[in-house]
């Protein structure tokens, strides 16, 4: 017995609904576009400029670059009170660690120097002997010494992020 087409035809279980198209709302597209745009802008800022453009700002006139700071000095030996008051803000007397580094460089240039430098001692008299980097505090600091003023320069957080990213990527 032959089958009729109407007997075995497909019959849906429920009323038919048109297929729903998945669409993102406009706010989601704006959010995704903003995120992608931000990533592209940061990538362009990190990758396009050279490393030199992310360097520290230059020292002021009359100051000399030293590591991440700037130094200025007076070649005339003076008393501690005069030395402390002679550095213009934001500079202070050179910190002990920076003074030791500078003394190491200065010893290379003049091994016979026996002078002293006043160093930042957090309110106490402190100085550093140039020849060997040995320091003295209070009663051992009666003689005049040279004043070396110092102010640090530090790159901002974004500059540190950029330079560390460039280092991680091996970019010059």
UniProtKB/Swiss-Prot annotation:
Membrane-crossing segments per the record: 28-48
Sequence ranges on the Virion surface membrane side: 49-172
Localization of this protein: Virion membrane
Superkingdom of the source species: Viruses
This protein's UniProt keywords: Membrane, Signal-anchor, Transmembrane, Transmembrane helix, Viral envelope protein, Virion
Residues on Intravirion side: 1-27
Classification via InterPro entries: Herpes_UL45
Membrane topology term: Single-pass type II membrane protein
Major place of residence: virion
Keyword flag Transmembrane: yes
Cellular component GO terms, alphabetical: membrane; viral envelope; virion membrane
Name of one Pfam family that matches: UL45
Function: Important virulence factor of HSV neurotropism. Seems to be required for glycoprotein B-induced fusion. Dispensable for growth in vitro.
Family: Belongs to the herpesviridae HHV-1 UL45 family.
Protein name: Envelope protein UL45
Organism: Human herpesvirus 1 (strain MP) (HHV-1)
């Amino acid at each position: 017995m032959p089958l009729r087409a109407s007997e075995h035809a497909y019959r849906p279980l429920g009323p038919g609904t048109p297929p729903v198209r998945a669409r993102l709302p406009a706010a989601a597209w704006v959010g995704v576009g903003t995120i992608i745009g931000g990533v592209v802008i940061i990538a362009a800022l990190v990758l396009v400029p050279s490393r030199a453009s992310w360097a520290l700002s230059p020292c002021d006139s009359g100051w000399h670059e030293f590591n991440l700071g700037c130094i200025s000095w007076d070649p005339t030996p003076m008393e501690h009170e005069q030395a402390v008051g002679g550095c213009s803000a934001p500079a202070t007397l050179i910190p002990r660690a920076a003074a030791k580094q500078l003394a190491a460089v200065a010893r290379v240039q003049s091994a016979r120097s026996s002078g002293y430098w006043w160093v930042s001692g957090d309110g106490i008299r402190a100085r550093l002997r140039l020849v060997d980097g040995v320091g003295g505090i209070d009663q051992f600091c009666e003689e005049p010494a040279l004043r070396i003023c110092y102010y640090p320069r530090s790159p901002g957080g974004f500059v540190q992020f950029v330079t560390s990213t460039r280092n991680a990527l091996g970019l010059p």
